[in-house]
Amino acid sequence: LSTYDLLTKRIDLLSERVSKLMIANATANRKIAHLVEFAGFSLTAISDFSKYFKALQANIENYVIAIAVKDTPGLCFTDALYADMQRIGVTINLTKKHWYGYAAIIDGGNLLAENSAYQKVVTVKATTEDGIAVVATSKPLKVGNATAISFNGVGGSVCRRGINIMVYDKTKKCVCDSVCFDTHVKGIDCHR
C-alpha cells in the first residue's frame, strides 16, 4: 500500500471514531440536560404527564417501573402521550384503545414484559436482574375495573382510572412513587 492509501485508511478510521464520539457526546449532553432540569425534584412533586416521563427517563437506569391501566387508557390518550411513554421503553400505543387492558414492566430502560388486550384482564410478571419480583395487572371496566401492582409481593397501586404507575428505586431499594394519570379527561388529572 502506498503512503496515500495508508493515510486515507487512517483518516477513514479516525472519521468513524469521531462520529461515534459525537453520538456519545450528544447522548451525554441529553442526559446532563435531563439531570439539570430535574435536579432536586422527587417524582412525587411532578403532576404533569410529559414532565413525569422525562423525569423517569433522566434516571431510568435506577428505576424499575410497573404500569397498569384501570378502566380504560381513555379517550384523551394521544400519540403525543405515547411518545412520552416511549421514552422509558413502552412499545404499545394506547391511542384509540378505549376499554383495553394494558400492563408493562421496565427495568433500567429495558422492557421486561408488556401486553394489552381488548376488554380482557392483562397480567405481566417479571423478575429483574436484581431479583425483584414484579407483577402488574390491568382490569378494564367490564372485567373488574381495577389495577394491582406489586414489588416482591408488596402492592401499592393508586388504582384509579387511567395509567397507574409504580416506581421502585433500585438505589434506595424501595418504591419511590405511585401515581395515576387519568388519560380519559383532557386535563390528564394526576392522583397519588
Give, region by region, the residue ranges found by the protein language model.
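Short acidic-hydrophobic catalytic motif
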Residues: 11, 23, 34-192
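Accessible peptide chain termini
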Residues: 1-2, 192
